[in-house]
Amino acid sequence: MSKILVVDDSYAELQVIEGVLKGANHTVVSFPNTEKLEDKVIGEKPDLIVLDVVMPGRNGFQACRDLKNDDRTKNIPIILCTSKGNESDKFWGQQQGANAHVVKPFKGEELLAAVKRVLG
């Protein structure tokens, strides 16, 4: 299956997302923040990034934009995973280059459906 990098500052959320993705036979690499995220992405070469929006320091919207503006990482699809579920946040995520948006709390099937849509 695919290698997926999950970025979330909440250890509990990382565990939930990892469990869902590993249960679907994906390889999962976790990262707790957006500091040095580009280096992590370049080193890991994931097929997909699941990125939380609400994080200290650089938020997920900013990190998404930075990854999509970097020639080394711009082609890696990103799913924003956040508690912000209103339409303006979804629109803003798309403007930053996100390929999909999953709202917390979510069911495992919702995340896996987004992964399948994005990866094909």
Identify the meaning behind each predicted range.
Residues 15-23:
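Charged docking surfaces used in two-component/phosphorelay signaling
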Residues 25-32, 40:
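Short hydrophobic/Thr-rich beta-strand motif most characteristic of the beta2 strand and flanking loop
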Residues 56-57, 74, 86, 105:
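The feature encodes the CheY-like receiver
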Residues 44-50:
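Active-site beta3 strand of CheY-like receiver
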